[in-house]
A protein has these predicted regions:
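The beta1-alpha1 cofactor-binding region of Rossmann-like NAD(H)/NADP(H)-dependent oxidoreductases
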Residues: 46-47, 67-79, 131
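Conserved glycine-rich Rossmann-like NAD(P)H-binding loop of the short-chain dehydrogenase/reductase
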Residues: 37-51
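Active-site loop of short-chain dehydrogenase/reductase
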Residues: 13, 61-62, 89-90, 114-121, ...
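Conserved glycine-rich cofactor-binding loop
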Residues: 14, 21-23
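A short, exposed helix-loop element centered on a Lys and neighboring polar residues
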Residues: 149-150
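Catalytic Tyr-X3-Lys loop
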Residues: 110-146, 161, 165
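A glycine-rich helix->loop->beta "capping" turn
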Residues: 11, 59-62, 82-95, 101-102, ...
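Structural signature of the Rossmann-like NAD(P)-dependent dehydrogenase/reductase core
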Residues: 17-18, 95-98, 162-167
Length: 167
């Protein structure tokens, strides 16, 4: 197994990582496993989750992939039950699921007065944002963090200890 970059021993701890099939959180998951944690990999793409779990286990770690929609409380509850049965109760939660949507973002970093006067369909300003796109981004980034935290932090609260990382 590669070097433990966290420089800590997490043996016996269970880490739940949302957004684990993404670039950033897959690296976090590997680091947690290298520190000795059993890692629950939550994400939308089971193929990527399985590949990551296989990679972690090939290095001697313990990891399981779970398809999870972090905006769906019932789905998160079901996954939490599976994690508890297979790995144990959550000690560490990394909330890494999130993202953006073209309907919920502008095409330019800054607004210029000329953008208001032009009718360029390639330029989307704050004033052109689609409320449904904004709603999706809000739900993904806010509710997609709130719901897993409500579910997995309950174990931590009952134990009186734990760690939550917001990415």
């Amino acid at each position: 197994m590669e070097q433990n970059v966290l420089n800590t021993d997490l043996t016996g701890k269970v880490a739940v990582v949302t957004g684990a099939s993404g670039t950033l959180c897959s690296i976090f998951a590997k680091a947690l496993a290298r520190a000795g944690a059993k890692v629950a990999l939550l994400g939308r793409n089971m193929e990527k989750l399985k590949a990551l779990a296989d990679e972690i286990e090939a290095e001697g770690g313990i990891a399981r992939g779970y398809t999870c929609n972090v905006m769906n409380k019932a789905n998160c509850l079901q996954v939490a039950e599976e994690v508890m049965a297979e790995l144990g109760s959550c000690d560490i939660l990394v909330n890494g699921a999130g993202g953006n949507n073209p309907k919920g973002t502008t095409t330019k970093e800054t607004l210029e007065k000329i953008d208001l006067a032009q009718q360029d369909p390639e330029v989307k300003t704050f004033f052109d944002l689609d409320p449904q796109g904004i709603s999706f981004v809000f739900n993904l980034n806010f509710l997609g963090t709130l719901i897993p935290t409500q579910i997995f932090a309950k174990d931590m609260a009952e134990k009186g200890k734990g760690c939550i990382v917001m990415v």
